[in-house]
Amino acid sequence: MKDHTESFKKKSLLSRLKMPIAELEDYYRRKRHFDRNKEIRHIALRRAYSKLFIPLLSMDRALHKKKYRIIGDRRIQTKNPKIYACTHVGSTDISVVYEALKDHCYWFWGDIGEYYRKIDGLLVFLNGAVLIDTRDKQDRRNARNTAVKVLQKGGNLLIFPEGAWNITESTPVMHLYTGAVEMAIESGADLIPVGIELYGNTFYINIGRNISSRNMQPDSKQKYTEKLRGAMAALK
């Protein structure tokens, strides 16, 4: 990996179009580090855009003959920002659960290679996304800090804290990283567990009750991460 602290020079669109994907990923990884102190802007505009984006997701789902059913929704109305912590069953669950939630969220998105030079990437960018190269420690730190700033500005976050697809039947929820709880503590966000199952072409989505971060302490992040994991497992 290149040193993120080296000087960064923005490149023209034409130059970026000519870059190989690996080089383009490195360019944007360094750009995210360069921009790490920038203010989060245009959340209201992105929220308005999501009213158009979600119907597009519905159309795409219908074209691929996918369905979803909400089998429970125990969300409590709140003025606090929200972190939707979802179980992860495959590559398309993020778009389906976002459609089902009907609540504007920034996507905490780790599929960097799929983001560039595709219309999907542009649409997600307009909606709002926190990109992360999970292989890179500095980029993980930058993504976490950016997500906290989004939440502090009143935005919501959609995240898969398992960090990988869970296709095992014996483990309802895999090990969770503590990042979701850490971000909730720093921003005052509510954690909302979401269980997702896929049978055939139908997603079954169960939305749990808010978990307040008000009384959480940083030194108890592992305890509350286990509480979140238990809540997610109970929804499957």
Question: Which ranges hold each PLM region?
Answer:
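Structural motif corresponding to alpha-helix initiation and N-cap regions
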Residues: 70, 117, 141-144
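A structural micro-motif
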Residues: 68, 104-106, 127, 155, ...
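Helix-enriched interaction subdomains in cytosolic or periplasmic regions
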Residues: 34-56
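Non-catalytic C-terminal accessory region of glycerolipid acyltransferases
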Residues: 2-33, 37, 141-236
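Helix-to-loop junction immediately C-terminal to a conserved catalytic motif
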Residues: 50-88
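Residue-level detector of flexible, active-site-proximal loop/helix-junction positions
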Residues: 74-77, 113-115, 136, 198-200, ...
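Catalytic core of membrane glycerolipid acyltransferases/transacylases, capturing the structured
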Residues: 78-137
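Structural signal for hydrophobic
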Residues: 70, 123-124, 191, 207
